[in-house]
A protein has these predicted regions:
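Solvent-exposed loop/turn segments flanking beta-strands in beta-repeat/beta-sandwich domains
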Residues: 69-104
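Solvent-exposed serine/threonine-rich low-complexity stretches and specific carbohydrate-binding patches
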Residues: 1, 95-126, 170
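Proline-enriched interdomain boundary motifs that mark the N-terminal boundary
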Residues: 44-51
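Structural beta-strand segments of beta-rich domains
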Residues: 58-62
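Solvent-exposed, conformationally flexible loop/turn segments
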Residues: 30-35, 41-43, 57, 110-118, ...
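Beta-strand-rich modules
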Residues: 7, 13, 119, 123-163, ...
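Structured interaction patches on ligand/partner-binding surfaces of diverse proteins
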Residues: 5, 13-43
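Beta-sandwich strand segments
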Residues: 20-27, 74-76, 160-169
Length: 172
């Protein structure tokens, strides 16, 4: 959703950008309120399988499934990277400050080389036994620590748009 209340009356070229098959530019005459809906083909579809499980060592284990979102072969590059993002705020993404670098888990292309699209992938959050290896750090994720944590999984291919490789995400 995009809402900009500071655009002046005039003719504008609109190009939606994201981790999806690109759409052509649309020329729009803006005068007053304009509502536009765009339907896109994501590069990947990423979905949770079941619920996160809190393990005895204080980590969370999750399962996800990644599938292609488009049949267009020009946008079916191999998986390049995936993350299980963990955050203490409900807006979880790959943006700076929107995830914990200590608790999130990164899967590189090498980690994903044996993964087949459509299969279930099991991932754990980082730092078993809490930060510092379970030395009593109060940031440990366990049932006695009441601060909420939010999880989100994102995966991306090697395809870049405007020099940016973009993630497709699960919900939070």
């Amino acid at each position: 959703t995009f809402n900009n209340t500071k655009i002046f009356k005039g003719t504008y070229g609109i190009i939606p950008e994201g981790p999806f098959v690109p759409l052509p530019e649309e020329i729009i005459d803006l005068e007053g309120v304009v509502k536009k809906n765009y339907f896109v083909e994501p590069l990947l579809r990423v979905q949770w399988v079941g619920e996160p499980v809190l393990k005895d060592d204080g980590t969370f284990e999750v399962q996800v499934k990644i599938t292609r979102g488009t049949d267009n072969p020009d946008y079916q590059q191999p998986l390049e990277e995936a993350w299980l993002f963990v955050s203490q705020i409900d807006y979880v993404s790959n943006a700076p400050g929107a995830y914990s670098t200590k608790l999130s888990t990164n899967l590189t292309q090498a980690d994903l080389r044996n993964y087949t699209l459509g299969d279930i992938l099991t991932i754990r959050t980082g730092y078993p036994n809490g930060w510092n290896g379970g030395t009593g750090d109060p940031q440990k994720i366990d049932g006695s620590y009441k601060r909420p944590y939010f999880l989100r999984f994102g995966a991306r291919t090697s395809k870049s748009f405007s020099s940016i490789k973009r993630y497709n995400f699960t919900d939070v």
